[in-house]
């Protein structure tokens, strides 16, 4: 009986230590979530201004003819897949990877028809183990990434489209809704849809050296900015999912502690009752 009580006590201590860790991880994830939300908000005006200028140029007769705005016969498709480097984030990685695999299976019959640009160690390991065709990868991103952290892989993907090595490019990530809701999303990045110009707020710009050259310079930057915006959303989704997972783990640990504490108290009561019974039996035997 004493051995069983000691084991329950050790188990309670272990669960309390685990609860302390998961509670701390939940708080850290909440702080990182807010940081990435703020960063996404800060980056939005830059993307909006580029979009405004592109819409102004593309509304002209020559702008919409740029190759990055034109559909062409699809021989090969590229996918930029955003995952995390770390686990303990609930279904964050599994959900987007399942979505990507289903999309690939529906659209392609051969591995020659597509290639994957992967961000995050979890995605890299997943696709590598299953021999999916990887075109480029980046891992080890900071929890609050800067644009420079993904400039290389985003630029490489856009360059392959411009060089007609791929004919369409999709962006795959967990779209942030709230801390408890993230939507696995696969959306077309290239060819870009020309942003619609708001005539009520239209501004007449003068472009040097020409509107066509400005557009040619801005479109790749705009595509890369969309990748960065998706990355920030994905990071917010990751921390939201991790915060929820750690919150659930903390609640489960509390439930286990309560059940173990009840078992511990019952075991102690049984041990005390048995000890009293033995004392009484011994006293009666001496009488």
Curated annotation (Swiss-Prot):
- InterPro entries in the record, alphabetically? ATP_synth_F1_ATPase_gsu, ATP_synth_F1_gsu, ATP_synth_F1_gsu_CS
The subcellular location is: Cell membrane
Gene3D superfamilies reported in the protein's UniProt record: 3.40.1380.10, ATP synthase, gamma subunit, helix hairpin domain
Question: Which Pfam family is one of those matched by this entry?
Answer: ATP-synt
Q: Where is the signal peptide?
A: none
State whether it acts alone or in a complex, and with which partners, per the record: F-type ATPases have 2 components, CF(1) - the catalytic core - and CF(0) - the membrane proton channel. CF(1) has five subunits: alpha(3), beta(3), gamma(1), delta(1), epsilon(1). CF(0) has three main subunits: a, b and c.
The entry assigns this protein to a family as follows:
Belongs to the ATPase gamma chain family.
* Described function: Produces ATP from ADP in the presence of a proton gradient across the membrane. The gamma chain is believed to be important in regulating ATPase activity and the flow of protons through the CF(0) complex.
Q: Per its record, how is this protein called by name?
A: ATP synthase gamma chain
Instruction: List the source organism.
Output: Brevibacillus brevis (strain 47 / JCM 6285 / NBRC 100599)
């Amino acid at each position: 009986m004493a051995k069983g009580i000691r084991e329950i006590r050790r188990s309670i201590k272990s669960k309390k230590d685990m609860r302390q860790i998961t509670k701390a991880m939940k708080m850290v994830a909440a702080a990182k979530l807010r940081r990435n939300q703020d960063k996404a908000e800060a980056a939005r005006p830059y993307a909006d201004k580029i979009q405004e200028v592109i819409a102004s140029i593309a509304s002209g007769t020559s702008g919409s003819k740029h190759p990055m705005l034109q559909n062409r016969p699809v021989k090969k498709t590229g996918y930029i897949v955003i995952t995390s480097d770390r686990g303990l984030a609930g279904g964050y990685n599994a959900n987007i990877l399942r979505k990507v695999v289903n999309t690939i299976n529906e659209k392609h019959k051969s591995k020659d028809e597509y290639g994957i640009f992967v961000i995050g160690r979890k995605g890299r390991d997943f696709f590598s183990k299953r021999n999916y065709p990887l075109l480029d990868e980046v891992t080890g991103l900071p929890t609050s990434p800067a644009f420079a952290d993904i400039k290389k892989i985003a630029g490489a993907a856009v360059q392959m489209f411009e060089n007609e090595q791929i004919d369409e490019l999709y962006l795959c990530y967990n779209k942030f809704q709230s801390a408890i809701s993230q939507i696995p999303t696969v959306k077309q990045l290239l060819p870009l849809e020309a942003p619609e110009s708001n005539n009520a707020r239209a501004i007449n710009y003068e472009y040097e050296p020409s509107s066509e050259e400005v557009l040619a310079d801005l479109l790749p930057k705009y595509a890369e900015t969309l990748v960065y915006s998706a990355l920030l959303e994905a990071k917010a989704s990751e921390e939201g999912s991790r915060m929820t997972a750690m919150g659930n783990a903390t609640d489960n640990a509390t439930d286990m502690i309560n059940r173990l504490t009840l078992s511990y108290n019952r075991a102690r009561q049984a041990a005390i009752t048995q000890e009293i019974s033995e004392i009484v039996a011994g006293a009666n035997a001496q009488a």
